[in-house]
């Protein structure tokens, strides 16, 4: 999930969170809904205070079955790369993204824009030693076994989306 966030630099609390279309802004009257024209066009965001903010919830093999690690980033390259990879793997696996053996990989690149200084971003790749054909075959088996045991990923995803939608500002105190 990626969106734009403007934080109060003194408290670390969110002041405005938007998706490029609409935003929720904290004012003296409470949380108000406004259009979100993106950081480049928003008068509140002048001076680079509003940044892209991405969160990727990842289930780790050794963690609790419903536990997750949350990768948070304000890096545009990481957000763009992760969004593209998630879409690719979701399409290639026929929607079995949660069953694929994936890993986060730190990559570096240098560009003319970065004056040849390396910039680092996170990529989503198949686990080392795994090819796409085998990963998809394994994902199908995992999905069938999970469903046979009564586990439905679609229902879990739906409930998670509902939970996100219920929060005025999703960023909790520990995330500020």
Tell me what each language-model feature is.
Residues 11-14, 78, 159:
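Residue-level detector of solvent-exposed, low-hydrophobicity positions
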Residues 1-63, 115-119, 165-170:
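OB-fold ssDNA-binding interfaces and closely related basic DNA-contact patches used
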Residues 45-135:
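Extended serine/threonine-enriched, polar tracts that run as long, contiguous segments within proteins
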Residues 134-176:
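Eukaryotic intrinsically disordered, low-complexity regulatory regions
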């Amino acid at each position: 999930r990626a969106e734009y966030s403007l934080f109060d630099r003194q408290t670390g609390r969110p002041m405005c969170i938007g998706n490029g279309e609409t935003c929720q802004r904290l004012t003296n009257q409470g949380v108000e809904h406004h259009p979100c024209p993106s950081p480049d066009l928003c008068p509140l965001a002048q001076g680079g205070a509003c940044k892209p903010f991405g969160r990727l919830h990842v289930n780790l093999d050794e963690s609790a079955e419903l536990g997750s690690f949350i990768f948070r980033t304000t890096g545009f390259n990481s957000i763009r790369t992760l969004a593209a990879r998630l879409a690719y793997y979701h399409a290639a696996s026929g929607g079995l993204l949660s069953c694929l053996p994936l890993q986060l990989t730190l990559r570096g690149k240098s560009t003319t824009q970065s004056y040849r200084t390396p910039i680092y971003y996170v990529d989503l790749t198949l686990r080392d030693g795994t090819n796409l054909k085998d990963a998809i075959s394994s994902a199908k088996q995992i999905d069938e076994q999970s469903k046979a045991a009564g586990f439905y990923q679609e229902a879990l995803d739906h409930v998670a989306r509902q939970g996100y939608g219920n929060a005025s500002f999703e960023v909790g105190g520990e995330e500020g």
